[in-house]
């Protein structure tokens, strides 16, 4: 860590902020998003710093790659959580049997979501994959503060926030030269396609909610 004293303090702060997150055993959705946004902001500020150097840029880039690897599985969990709760019950039986959402069929407006999930099922992040069907992804009540949201609204918000964060991160990575690596370039292009699909789904959902509330 001593070498960081000769680098831009913004990059040093960004790296340390994310190192704290990686040292935690159990990290909530809110903490990951906040730390990701802070790290991106600090690294962008470093571009204007006189102490900014190639070593600073390389360290920031490596940190972004680690964040990317953490956010992609989070997006998968958010999509799966949202999709699972949109799918109507398959049976009125009291016995609950878990079904992988990627194998379900989606009616009408939810067909886009089904397509996203099927595309995502073959996507592999830089991190070890977890089973998304067993995880729930939504903001905590502490983050929402005075705003009261039902379960579907909070899951919608989680998707929206993750999409925005990932899109900003992918853009930064591409600007820093991530496109030179063919494997990363392919993953980024595919992820951007998924983000566009999810954003379209969210916009359609917002329009539907507005009509219902009017």
Curated annotation (Swiss-Prot):
Keyword annotations for this protein, in alphabetical order, are: Glycoprotein, Signal
- Is Signal among this UniProt entry's keywords? yes
Q: Which domain of life is it from?
A: Eukaryota
Signal peptide interval:
1-17
Pathway(s) where this gene product acts? Secondary metabolite biosynthesis
Q: Which residues are glycosylated?
A: 103, 204
| Function as written in the Swiss-Prot or TrEMBL entry | Part of the cla gene cluster that produces clavatol and ortho-quinone methide. The clavatol biosynthesis cluster cla and the terrestric acid cluster tra are both involved in the production of peniphenones and penilactones. The non-reducing PKS claF is responsible for the formation of clavatol from successive condensations of 3 malonyl-CoA units, presumably with a simple acetyl-CoA starter unit, and 2 methylation steps. The esterase claE probably collaborates with claF by catalyzing the hydrolysis of ACP-bound acyl intermediates to free the ACP from stalled intermediates.
This protein's name: Clavatol biosynthesis cluster protein B
Species per Swiss-Prot/TrEMBL record: Penicillium crustosum
